[in-house]
Amino acid sequence: MTKFNQLQTKDDFAKLLGLKSAKYINYLLYNIKTDNLYNSFPIPKKNGGERVIHAPKKELKFLQKKLSNVLWECYLESIESKSKDKNFKTPVLSHAFEKGKSIITNSQMHRNKKYILNIDLKNFFDSFNFGRVRGFFIKDRDFAVSPEIATVIAQIACYQGKLPQGAPSSPIITNLITRILDYRIVKIAKKYRFTYSRYADDMTFSTNRELNSNKLRTSKELKNFLAELEEVIISSGFEINPKKTRLSNNMQRQ
């Protein structure tokens, strides 16, 4: 049981965030309205084009930081509790937005592997809409909050009905929601003897197995692997960006 499981009212939730009551939360949500508390601006993407960042203003950012902190505490508490169960192994799968993890630790998992497969999740942050965020906090057993409190969490975290890139609460919420996807993916990866990790929307798989029957045609087993991956990804509410799917061998990466 976590601190969230014990919440009864909005005031309980406010106190969990370190506030005296829900008065400040109600003021932002229903008087000012959170959609009026963002500054939006474009930043260039590494491979061309632009990404729009929605940065919360200080009043909302203050609240989102508090939400992020208590979600992290609950997340770590859940992992610690499960790690005590000998039948449960907590794999290190997500390397983005995780304390002690980075793009470097993500790449280290695939060092010296013969083949590396990269799969990109299309419009990653847009996949986390208001209903999905709200539903997660109602249904997930680590939280299991009332519909009223789940609605408040989603209102604090979402901008124009989605999790915004630029809000301090977005990273932890995306990692919480994608945990189930990661666990499903790692089962498929193990079945085909792949190592799997994820950095936000970038999934990486690697293996030392021989994947190509010849240089022009991909093996049937790899096709089956990709088909199973796609089925799980789509059923989990995400979409693959086919333009960014890439298979490379160690000779190509030199």
Residue ranges, per PLM feature:
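N-terminal low-complexity, intrinsically disordered segments
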Residues: 13-25, 70, 81-91, 122, ...
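Conserved polymerase palm-domain catalytic core
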Residues: 106-200, 204-250, 254
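N-terminal, well-ordered alpha-helical segments
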Residues: 11, 41, 61, 65-69, ...
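Short, conserved non-catalytic motifs in the polymerase core
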Residues: 39-64, 83, 94-96, 155-174
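Short amphipathic beta-strand starts and helix->beta connectors
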Residues: 36-39, 100-103, 188-192
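Non-catalytic, polymerase-adjacent accessory regions of viral genome-replication enzymes
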Residues: 1-46
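Generic structural signal for well-ordered secondary structure
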Residues: 6, 56, 60-68, 130
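Active-site-proximal segment of RNA-dependent polymerases
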Residues: 63-116
